[in-house]
């Protein structure tokens, strides 16, 4: 165990003054992009680049939990329109950068440190039978839309009825009726 200079540490209560970003628009910086060829998508990990929450995910927790601050660029045939829209948002946010040329050249490293606007939406999920919330990217936009206040928070994405945790048992057994009570015909 290491010695700590307690004189330089400010005490906080458990849960303390931890503040997380609210749903809505943020200017984000792309930290890394990784291709998953089998599933036909690129996972884009981001950090918030401007404002009160700049570098929010750059701490140890954020670096070890990239799934908490990422979005996908799917290149399945059915999602190419959305991919093009997201690449156009990256292009509008980074004058002089051609994300289409970088994409076609397979140079995902060229996206690192590029800016993009994102809209974070709160969504419900179930964990150990309890409903919790997390932030997820619901929209990728040009950074100027965020700066101009054009990006509005969306309502919380609720669990649908089929996924909501239930306190009732899944199957209720009916009482047995007309049960055979005679001798067992085989031994």
Task: Report the location of each language-model feature.
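Short beta-rich binding modules
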Residues: 1-187
């Amino acid at each position: 165990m290491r010695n700590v200079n307690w004189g330089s540490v400010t005490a906080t209560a458990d849960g303390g003054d931890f503040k997380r970003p609210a749903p809505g628009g943020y200017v984000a910086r792309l930290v890394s992009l990784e291709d998953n060829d089998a599933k036909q998508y690129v996972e884009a990990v981001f950090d918030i680049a401007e404002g009160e929450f700049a570098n929010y995910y750059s701490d140890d927790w954020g670096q070890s939990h990239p799934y908490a601050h990422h979005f996908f660029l799917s290149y399945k045939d059915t999602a190419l329109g959305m991919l093009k829209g997201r690449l156009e948002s990256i292009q509008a946010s980074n004058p002089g950068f051609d994300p289409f040329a970088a994409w076609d050249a397979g140079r995902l490293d060229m996206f690192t440190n590029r800016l993009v606007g994102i809209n974070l939406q709160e969504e419900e999920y179930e964990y150990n039978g309890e409903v919790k919330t997390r932030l997820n990217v619901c929209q990728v936009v040009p950074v100027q839309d965020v700066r101009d206040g054009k990006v509005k928070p969306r309502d919380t994405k609720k669990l649908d009825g089929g996924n909501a945790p239930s306190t009732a048992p899944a199957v209720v057994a009916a009482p047995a009726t007309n049960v055979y009570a005679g001798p067992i015909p085989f031994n």
